[in-house]
A protein has these predicted regions:
Chain C
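C-terminal signal-anchor/stop-transfer transmembrane helix together with its immediate cytosolic
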Residues: 1-31, 275-326
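Alpha-helical transmembrane signal-anchor/signal-peptide segments
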Residues: 27-40, 44
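…and closely analogous acidic/polar surface helices at protein-protein or active-site interfaces
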Residues: 33-34, 46-81, 100-105
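Juxtamembrane amphipathic/hinge helix adjacent to a transmembrane helix
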Residues: 35-39, 254-292
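DG-centered beta-turn motif at the end of beta-strands
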Residues: 41-43, 84, 134-135, 141-162, ...
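Second-shell loop/turn segments in exported
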Residues: 51-61, 71-72, 94-99, 115-122, ...
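Short beta-strand-loop
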Residues: 80-114, 271-272
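VWA/integrin I-like adhesion module and closely mimicked acidic/polar interface patches used
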Residues: 151-244
């Protein structure tokens, strides 16, 4: 399903760096005697939290971007019109000759080349199909499991004109084909398309197995018989008197066997590439059923999104930083009147001499000794005296 | 007499501080004290029999006495007091006291020391942050060099630490005798702590000095973001400066100051506001009108 | 205006770098891709169990090939193509032509998982002939070969008739991959229904080649009979046991211009394929955005990280300075 992935998950180890903004502020701080000097303010608190969050967010986003955040390619289930098809292709060496049973030359293509060409078209026309490819000859071979990757189907069909093997073991090929439907293929849309240019006797045990498989997994069966000139056809009956045995008329008996399976079955006998094409078109028209198929949405890189978001956060942070104010640049404004100077004072009565000192200005204040000064000891408070005591003052005081 | 040369801080002046109530103590000084003395303000007349001091016979009063008794003049006793500064040196006090510019606290303390010693009182200082700072303290002394020395030491000691609990412990060292105690602090502590401190000083005449800075009481008027850091706790706060917040801020500061005033009045005197810089005239005015 | 705070500069730099990263600068680079067809030996000797799976249980050579090959091709760079074929007897059978690995990995992995020794159409195992046939097949397809086999010729090769390769050594590149252990192990035997019925014994398999005319001097071999036993009697041998024939595969590789590697972990196999197949450079866009993004992150970390570090340093240094007076 939809999931996020990382190209470099180890970069996520840098995520704890996002704690830094909680500890440090990008703004220059102004020391104040106490946090309580400023009143509570909701807006300020929100903005403060916002600045912390922006810093953390910017770091988180950059780290996410660096770790290559992406949305994984994911598979979307879609319903379409098509089928789940197993292409069961004969790869016996007789497929390498032409319909006229000759070595292929420039003018005439071999049966396998024609089948390859027409089946490739068939697969390309039907995007909603899920296709599996199996080959059979002496032994059955799974080529591609059920897939909706049409590339893969094309590559598998592309290999069918390679030189084939000796025999044609239809029965085991079919039982492989039955086993290739997976759970995701809806039952009503299952089809097997058997492409062969001949038939063979099916072992009785294999026949039983096929009957059991047909009863278990009902599929529609198409047999595209590429009839070579001079070979027997599906409908050819033996002339009276000839033994009518599977050994002598394998095609006819295979057809009969298919009919006894109790499956929706059709056979097409094609004597030329044109007839193959017609048959395939007919199968195409018949196999139009609602199917569930999956489409892969390729991965989407999200790092650019992270970077843009980080840049946005940084822009806001920069704006905050640029509107930074500091108490250090501010001398203050004596707006607050001193309560005493506001005329509150006067609690204690003025002592004697008080009026005189109040009247005097600074100069008078420091030049006049207190009027009630008792007799000075040791020569009074001369300034030179004060300084002469300095050298030992520290020791004395501590 | 000329002021001391301003080598260690600004020029210092005498300050008209006074002790509320009468001082106790035998050492002669400049403050009204309990008891009678030989000098100073006239107190009453006494009989020569009661006070056989022939030098102070008030002839006029003796003549006017209908009983003809000899009257001797009695004077108030004037005693020396101890002037103490209890200085809060917690982290919050380091605001704008980085040793570069003016240091109003050092100026104030040195001025008090100077004035006290000049007035033949003894000066002492107790400093504390979260812990008592014994090495900064000054025992009650009348030594002349103390103001300058103190100024230099305080200028170099901006204050550090969280809370001013140390003050409460440190004030135990104050003398038992009633003294004039200037409590110098920004009082940016919980109200209960302030009252504990003032309560512990019940014995003394307490004159609070509130160290304030107008920069933090009225923030800059421009729009912008201001992030403050509590010098004590290190707590950060972001503030979106705008006119409405500025008004709230100023009102907040006013309210805090008013609450402080309330406490101070309950414990005696109103406080002196040491705003931004030490203004000796203002301090003198304060002492004359509201304080000692 | 005063000189801006360095933090403003750091923020501005981070912003600018973030925008640059968001614009996704790209550069063109070439990435090697590979176009290979893997042929898997599905002869009987591949059923010998001398590998161990992830949980340590014995695993047949074919199963080991299936798990490791599909992992290894997943490690090839995107854009690489892979086809698949099987080999028994003296020929190879192409299941599908090369297709894009990244886009069709599921189908490829499914096809590899579907490989089975029962696909084999004959019991013989003429490795050299099959390699030659595979090379012939691939030459027009312009694909390289990965031939996974244990190198066991059955029946054995004639020792007196040297092997020769007449094709062009440079037409197809690639490698032979030796599958199996170096210890001799028995080969499981199956009956007509594919059930395992034990192991091959010495008498079950020819221990020496009987193909072609008898060698000169065969008259002197024990059991020689001109009509019934022109090669002499079947010698005793170890052809019913199997191990990977590394030296033989190495010789075969040198003869055909192919490399040789032992089947090991998938990464090693992917590396071996990359080393031996012809790289086909395809232009790919290389995203340069991590560079500015990393620089932006660095600027942010400096913005947030330097002040506390500086504070830490300051706290450590001046313990004497604050109390210098006393």
């Amino acid at each position: 399903m939809t999931g996020l992935g990382f190209d470099h998950p180890w970069a996520l180890l840098l995520l704890p760096l996002a704690l830094l903004p909680f500890l440090v502020s990008p703004l220059r701080l102004s020391g104040v005697p106490s946090a309580e000097v400023a009143p509570e303010d909701t807006l300020s608190r929100a903005v403060g939290a916002g600045i912390v969050a922006l810093g953390a967010l910017a770091i988180v986003l950059l780290v996410l971007g660096l770790s290559g955040l992406h949305r994984r390619d994911h598979v979307v289930e879609r319903t379409g019109v098509g089928a789940n098809i197993v292409l069961l292709i004969d790869r016996s060496s007789s497929m390498d000759s032409t319909f006229a049973n000759r070595r292929p030359d420039g003018a005439e293509e071999s049966k396998s080349v024609a089948a390859r060409r027409l089946l490739t078209d068939f697969a390309a026309r039907r995007p909603a199909d899920r296709v599996a490819v199996a080959a059979f000859s002496t032994a059955p071979m799974l080529v591609i499991p059920m897939t909706d990757k049409h590339d893969a189907v094309r590559a598998a069909i592309g290999a069918i004109d390679r030189p084939g093997l000796a025999h044609t073991d239809v029965g085991r090929g079919l039982s492989l084909a039955f086993s290739m439907f997976d759970e995701t293929s809806t039952e009503t849309s299952r089809a097997i398309v058997l492409v062969s240019d001949g038939a063979a006797v099916i072992d009785r045990r294999v026949q039983d197995a096929l009957r059991a498989a047909a009863a278990r997994d009902p599929v529609r069966l198409y047999w595209l018989f590429l009839r070579t000139a001079g070979a027997r056809g599906i409908t050819d009956r033996p002339p009276p008197g000839d033994p009518d045995s599977p050994q002598t008329y394998p095609e006819r008996h295979l057809d009969i066997f298919f009919k006894t399976l109790g499956l929706p079955y059709r056979s097409f006998e094609a004597r030329s590439a044109g007839e193959v094409s017609d048959a395939i078109r007919e199968i195409d028209q018949l196999e139009q059923r609602p199917t569930l198929y999956s489409e892969t949405i390729p991965r989407q890189d999200l790092d650019w999104l992270c970077y843009w978001a980080a840049a946005g956060a940084l822009l806001l942070l920069l704006a905050a930083k640029l509107s930074e104010r500091r108490l250090e640049d501010w001398e203050g404004e004596a707006l607050l009147p001193s309560p005493l100077r506001g005329g509150v004072g006067g609690g204690g009565g003025a002592g004697e001499g008080a009026t005189r000192i109040v009247a005097s200005r600074r100069r008078a204040l420091h030049s006049a000794p207190p009027p009630t000064l008792a007799l000075p000891r040791k020569g009074g408070g001369n300034a030179p005296d004060v300084h002469s005591q300095q050298p030992d003052s520290g020791r004395a005081a501590s | 007499m000329s002021p001391a040369p301003a080598r260690d801080g600004p020029p210092r002046f005498d300050l008209p501080y006074r002790l509320f109530g009468r001082a106790r103590g035998v050492a002669t000084g400049g403050h009204k004290a309990l008891g009678q003395g030989a000098n100073g303000a006239f107190l009453r007349h006494a009989s020569l029999l009661e006070q056989p001091d022939a030098r102070r016979i008030d002839m006029r009063a003796s003549l006017l006495d209908p009983f003809g008794g000899l009257k001797v003049r009695r004077f108030e006793h004037r005693a020396r007091i101890d002037v103490f500064v209890v200085l809060d040196l917690s982290g919050s006090m380091s605001f704008r006291r980085d040793g570069q510019g003016e240091d109003p606290v050092a100026d104030l303390c040195a001025a008090i020391a100077h004035a006290a010693i000049r007035s033949h009182d003894r000066f002492g200082l107790i400093a504390a942050g979260p812990e008592p700072l014994a090495e900064l303290g000054v025992r009650a002394t009348a030594r002349r060099g103390v103001p300058d020395e103190l100024w230099r030491r305080l200028s170099a000691e901006p204050g550090a630490g969280r809370g001013s609990r140390g003050l409460l412990a440190a004030v135990e060292e104050l003398p038992q005798r009633r003294a004039l105690v200037f409590v110098v602090s920004d009082f940016l502590m919980p109200q209960a702590e302030i009252e504990d401190l003032l309560g512990a000083l019940w014995r003394h005449d307490v004159a609070p000095v509130v160290v304030r800075s107008s920069a933090v009481e009225a923030p800059p008027p421009r729009f912008g973001l201001l992030e403050t850091r509590d010098l004590e706790t290190g707590r950060r706060r972001l503030l979106v400066m705008r006119p409405s917040l500025r008004e709230k801020w100023i009102a907040h500061a006013r309210a805090r100051r008013a609450a402080l005033d309330e406490s101070f009045r309950r414990f005696g005197r109103p406080a002196f506001d040491l705003v931004d810089r030490f203004d000796a005239d203002a301090f003198a005015d304060h002492l004359l009108t509201g304080g000692a | 205006m005063r000189r801006p705070d360095w933090r403003t500069v750091a923020l501005g730099a981070a912003l600018a770098l973030g925008v640059v990263a968001a614009l996704q600068p790209e550069t063109e680079a070439e990435r090697p891709t590979y176009d290979v067809v893997a042929f898997v030996d599905i002869t009987g000797s591949m059923n010998a169990r001398d590998y161990r799976d992830a949980s340590g249980r014995p695993q047949s050579r074919l199963e080991a090939v299936k798990t490791r090959l599909s992992t290894a091709v997943g490690r090839l760079p995107c854009g690489s193509k892979m086809g698949l074929g099987v080999f028994t007897e003296r020929r190879v059978f192409l299941l599908f032509e090369p297709m894009d690995i990244c886009r069709n990995y599921g189908a490829i992995a499914g096809a590899i998982a579907g490989l089975d020794w029962r696909m084999g159409w004959e019991g013989d195992s003429r490795v050299a002939s099959a390699v030659f046939a595979a090379l012939d097949m691939l030459a027009p397809m312009n694909a390289d070969i990965v031939f996974l086999t244990d190198g066991q010729e059955a029946p054995p090769m004639r020792t007196d008739m040297p092997l020769e390769y007449s094709g062009d050594k440079d037409k197809v590149k690639g490698l032979l991959v030796g599958v199996g252990g170096t210890e001799l192990v028995p080969i499981p035997k199956h009956d007509d229904f594919g059930r395992e019925t034990g192991f091959y014994a010495m008498e079950d398999v020819p221990q020496a080649s009987r193909l072609g005319p008898p060698p000169t001097g065969a008259e002197n071999l024990p059991g020689y009979n001109a009509r019934n036993a022109p090669f002499g009697e079947m010698p005793a041998g170890e052809e019913h046991l199997t191990s990977v024939r590394e030296s033989y595969l190495g010789d075969l590789g040198r003869m055909t211009g192919l490399g040789y590697a032992r089947l090991d972990q998938p990464d090693a196999l992917a590396q071996a394929i990359a080393a031996n197949a012809r790289p086909r450079p395809v232009p790919v866009a290389v995203d340069l955005s991590p560079l500015p993004a990393a620089a932006a992150l660095l600027a942010l970390v400096a913005l947030y990280g330097v002040p506390p570090l500086a504070r830490l340093g300051r706290r450590r240094a001046p313990t004497h300075a604050s109390r210098s007076f006393n």
